[in-house]
Amino acid sequence: MKMNNRYFAALLGGTMLLTTSCSDLDTNPSGSTMGDGQLNEVLSQDPSKLKSEVSGMYANMIEYGAIIQWAGSTRHFDFGYASTMLMMDASGQDEPSQVSGYNWYNQPLRFVDRTANSQPTYFIWNQCYKNIKVANDVLKSVDLENLSDVAKSYVGQAYAMRAFEYFTLIQLYQFTYKGHEDAAGVPLVTEKTTEAEANNN
């Protein structure tokens, strides 16, 4: 009987330990992790810290494996803006290509990558809008009326990167001008666009 009591006590104690929760785990991260609000506060106080955000835009241009999570594995074209340039070259009408086992950019060459669920399309769309978001975050984090010279440099780079990414998108996804003179290009997201507007864009 004493042995059963010991097992019962051990089982009861184990159950109590496993079913109690730690309130320490319910806190927001602090220390090495910053939320958007904290980041904006730091950037507004010291605009030189914008350098890390702006550097992130350039790092996105050479990011390898950007769509691994979406695609399920790496893709041969998933190595940054250089790959986008190759796809744009392959999409031109002056690029002859024979079908071979090594034909990496055969989708753009055959114009079959123009669908919403195409991996090359997702790659380009994701790459461009990721940089547009970072540029918008830089622009949101500073007071555009009172900029220091350092902040002006970073804000200028953010505007330039955003314009460059829209230029890339419009070349690929805009209708031809003839017959579509009033057609919209690509969804426009700026630093002033709300989340609801972006979702309905």
Residue ranges and their predicted role:
Residues 172-201:
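Short coil/linker segments at helix-helix boundaries
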Residues 1-20:
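Sec-dependent bacterial lipoprotein signal peptides
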Residues 63-68, 165-176:
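Secretory-pathway/luminal and periplasmic proteins that interact with or process carbohydrate-rich
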Residues 27, 41, 111-113, 188-191, ...:
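Generic structural "secondary-structure junction" signal
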Residues 97-172:
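Conserved, well-structured interaction surfaces
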Residues 63, 69-116, 125, 191-193:
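A structural signal for short, hydrophobic/glycine-enriched beta-strand patches
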Residues 22-80, 145:
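Membrane-proximal, proline-rich intrinsically disordered regions
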Residues 1, 22-23, 57, 135, ...:
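Terminal processing/anchoring signals of secreted or surface-associated proteins
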